[in-house]
Amino acid sequence: MSNSRSNRPQSERTRARTSAGSPSSTGKKSGAAPASPAAKSGPVARAKASTGPPPAIETVELAKRYGDAPALWPLDLRIGAGERISLIGHNGSGKTTLMRMLVGMLEPSEGTATIAGHPIGSIEARAAVSYLADQPVFYDDLTVWEHLEYIARLHGTDDWEQQAVDLVDMVGLMDRVDDLPTTFSRGLKQKAALTMAFVRPFDVMLIDEPFVGLDRLGKEALLELLALAHGDGATLVVATHELSSVKESGRLIALSSGEVTYDGDPADADLAALTEGVRQDRE
């Protein structure tokens, strides 16, 4: 495999590719609850373009409630194709709720959302987005390699084998590909889940707390994979407590109690104030 990204075969959706350890590329409130303050605007209030491709992610009054308790206030959000976003906030701030609705795992209480112009939960939206959950889930009887093959073939990836080899080598799991990931430690499970998220093609990647449990090698591999995927044009949204990684993003969105409290340039953000009391991830 060539180390030049320009020589890599291009597909309609991004493929995270590596080269054997050295990658070549790879709201407002509603319902029974009292009204809330107006949603923060920031860049999400920018006028929509009348022409051109649809945004990678768009939400209109998207909200989630559990009974009368809001998990996410109605949210209007627009993320353009190719943006790299860091999503921060305390546990319970709404980050995971938002991501799960976007990938079709959680039914919104109200509002709408699209992925690459397609309604969330549709076949097209599911094909466009790769999701790494905060708690990876594996099949009990499949090895790491069998998981990779299943996911790659499910998404029509013909040349998945070399790609899979490169990914497992990069995260340091080459000697564990024939083992069941359900038996792994938290850190090894996270590494296995990373390979599975990147082995398939995608336009949009949503990752929830990916640094949890990773050692130095794993964190370096993750950052490199994200950089390469972004370089290939993928839209990335990374929910994280790893504040040192925020500087790699072009846009920062902070949530607190289900509302946006900041949306803008990470360099202009007061991270200490936005994340007061949040414990950063540790190995």
Predicted regions: what they are:
Residues 111-125:
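Conserved ABC transporter NBD signature motif
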Residues 239-241:
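H-loop/switch region of ABC-family ATPase nucleotide-binding domains
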Residues 88-90:
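The feature captures the beta-strand-to-loop junction immediately N-terminal to the Walker
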Residues 205-209:
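Catalytic Walker B motif of ABC-type/P-loop ATPase nucleotide-binding domains
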Residues 216-218:
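Helix N-cap at the start of a conserved alpha-helix in ABC-type nucleotide-binding domains
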Residues 103:
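Helix-to-loop junction immediately C-terminal to a conserved catalytic motif
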Residues 149, 153-176:
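Conserved ABC ATPase "signature" region
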